[in-house]
Amino acid sequence: MERYENLFAQLNDRREGAFVPFVTLGDPGIEQSLKIIDTLIDSGADALELGVPFSDPLADGPTIQNANLRAFAAGVTPAQCFEMLALIREKHPTIPIGLLMYANLVFNNGIDAFYARCEQVGVDSVLVADVPVEESAPFRQAALRHNIAPIFICPPNADDDLLRQVASYGRGYTYLLSRSGVTGAENRGALPLHHLIEKLKEYHAAPALQGFGISSPEQVSAAVRAGAAGAISGSAIVKIIEKNLASPEQMLAELRSFVSAMKAASRA
């Protein structure tokens, strides 16, 4: 959890927002996936949001569902994902690493064992996409026992009660949804979120990162101008992977220029 605090303090000093890319671990295969993650970090990513392949990712649009399918086709298992996470942490000791999960994967070996394994490999946060705040007690309690930040989603239509709960239970960062629905670069997020961000700050919530539909540098600078601590981009990055499956080096080159431009926009 301290890695998030350190990151946001440093970015604050530099008057920058965070740019956080999302990819699915093991897409399109373990070796290339590790190269992709190194490229994201080397190109300026401030933190990572990583998915573990899951057969039925409800909150995700077709782009990220396809990433899951590619990782499955490559035979990637949750155990291998944890091995990858250990390698990433060893190579990049300071970057915050967040997991985006579904509850079934957490339940598989028992909730406590899951968070213990996260702690062991150096994961900083876990967002369980299909567990609402009111059902989150066993997850967030296990997370905190193992020094893992429980991450909560703040939807654009959140009422005051939900904002208070998210602020009270969340650590690390708050995942601020640009809009309702499934993830995807084609569904551009454009709701006025500054009022939600102000409320979250008033209730001392963890810093808000805006996600869902973030696919251009302009959207990153708009999120930061609205008061968010930064932005998360997933589908736009996964599309670059999908488009360049036949040319791995081209894939890394395109990821490099995309992430550099998105990060540059967080300084605007």
Curated annotation (Swiss-Prot):
Which residues are annotated as active site? E49, D60
Which UniProt keywords are present, listed alphabetically?
Answer: Amino-acid biosynthesis, Aromatic amino acid biosynthesis, Lyase, Tryptophan biosynthesis
The job of this chain, per UniProt, is described as: The alpha subunit is responsible for the aldol cleavage of indoleglycerol phosphate to indole and glyceraldehyde 3-phosphate.
Q: Which gene encodes it?
A: trpA
- Report the leader peptide range: none
State what protein this is by name. Answer: Tryptophan synthase alpha chain
PROSITE patterns for this protein: TRP_SYNTHASE_ALPHA (PS00167)
Which family is this protein grouped under?
Belongs to the TrpA family.
Say yes or no: keyword Transmembrane present: no
Which GO cellular component terms are attached? Answer: cytosol
Pathway noted in the entry = Amino-acid biosynthesis; L-tryptophan biosynthesis; L-tryptophan from chorismate: step 5/5
A molecular-function term among this protein's GO annotations:
tryptophan synthase activity
The EC number(s) attached to this protein equal 4.2.1.20
Which SUPFAM superfamilies does its entry note? Ribulose-phoshate binding barrel
Reaction(s) catalyzed by this protein?
(1S,2R)-1-C-(indol-3-yl)glycerol 3-phosphate + L-serine = D-glyceraldehyde 3-phosphate + L-tryptophan + H2O
- Write down the superkingdom of origin: Bacteria
Q: Which HAMAP family match?
A: Trp_synth_alpha
- Give the record's subunit note: Tetramer of two alpha and two beta chains.
**Coiled coil regions, renumbered to chain:** none
